Amino acid sequence: MEGEQQQLRNLRDFLLVYNKMTELCFSRCAKNLNYRSVTMEEEQCLDSCASKFIRANHRLMSAYVSLMPSVVQRRMAEYEGAAANVPPIETEPSADHMPPVISSHSGNSPTNKQLDSVSDLPVGK
């Protein structure tokens, strides 16, 4: 599932770059729309424009790939530093944070004296 999503993101990114390059090169090179075929001048312009765009994209990607490990390493160090500053979560509440016990001594609830006598009983193994 994750692999398919990554492929879709890659395809989307490729299509965005392709569409941007096509739009940019067309606006720069297509001067005369009176003919069905591309003129020699337009063809050379399109070839030059596309080549420049592709070379620039390759240079940017190589710079990105070379910088990415250091960026990931720096982010991991930041996350670990932030995690070290977070106070640990208490698993059992302390006596200071315990809510007060409200008891009503009705006929069915045990009293403190009855509870104390139960805690004195021997525990079986």
UniProtKB/Swiss-Prot annotation:
Assembly behavior: Component of the TIM22 complex.
Keyword check for Mitochondrion: yes
Entry membrane topology: Peripheral membrane protein
PANTHER family tied to this protein: MITOCHONDRIAL IMPORT INNER MEMBRANE TRANSLOCASE SUBUNIT TIM9B
Superkingdom of source: Eukaryota
Matching InterPro entries: Mito_inner_translocase_sub, Tim10-like, Tim10-like_dom_sf
Known role: Component of the TIM22 complex, a complex that mediates the import and insertion of multi-pass transmembrane proteins into the mitochondrial inner membrane. The TIM22 complex forms a twin-pore translocase that uses the membrane potential as the external driving force.
A Pfam family this chain is assigned to: zf-Tim10_DDP
GO MF entries: metal ion binding
Keyword annotations: Disulfide bond, Membrane, Metal-binding, Mitochondrion, Mitochondrion inner membrane, Protein transport, Translocation, Transport, Zinc
Record protein name field: Mitochondrial import inner membrane translocase subunit Tim10 B
GO BP annotations, alphabetical order: protein transport
Keyword Nucleotidyltransferase: no
Region called Disordered, residue ranges: 87-125
Biased composition (Polar residues): 103-117
GO cellular component assignments: mitochondrial intermembrane space protein transporter complex; TIM22 mitochondrial import inner membrane insertion complex
Gene3D superfamilies associated with the record: Mitochondrial import inner membrane translocase subunit tim13 like domains
